[in-house]
């Protein structure tokens, strides 16, 4: 299974450049801040397993002279392994034009997706399939801003596209040539939906957990 690397960019913006960097801006404090945020995410039951609502994915593609058109209904979709997220290496803090930024990487080797798939291609082809995959690199962008007293709050949070998705479809039999067509359609439409659902679920959790951050 491919290594999952999550690049998280924490930007602490809107601050005046100071002659001496405050204690909570050193690398140790950045690591401490990020570790608290990560811990709060990995302990949430909603995160693992993460369930995706039923959705219908359109299929419309030409292979040579053959035009394949129809849909695939995704049911009982579940992403597992998100709770294994952890920080790797130190957060690095740099200053640029009075802003502070920390870059770090989080890693995991257990991200998987499983779903039932009902294929509807014309009047004849309606198989029920089992669909599973391994998800590769995911980028996560997290921006924090500080008020005048140095208290952090969430400024921006988003998840980039799921890349390096390795998919396996069971139950096609003689329809195996359709694997690539189904996989391409799945990634194209599942990617934005899954990203939005994960983002919408995590964002309010982040807002509350950032309020609880304690820097020693």
UniProtKB/Swiss-Prot annotation:
Gene3D superfamilies to which the protein is assigned, alphabetical: 3.15.10.50
Subcellular compartments: Secreted
Keywords: Allergen, Secreted, Signal
Domain of life: Eukaryota
Family: Belongs to the mite group 7 allergen family.
Residues making up the signal peptide according to the UniProt record: 1-19
Pfam families: Grp7_allergen
Name of the protein this chain belongs to: Mite allergen Lep d 7
Keyword Nucleus: no
Gene Ontology CC annotations of this record: extracellular region
Species of the source: Lepidoglyphus destructor
Keyword GTP-binding assigned: no
Family annotation (InterPro entries): Mite_allergen_7_sf (IPR038602), Mite_allergen_group-7 (IPR020234)
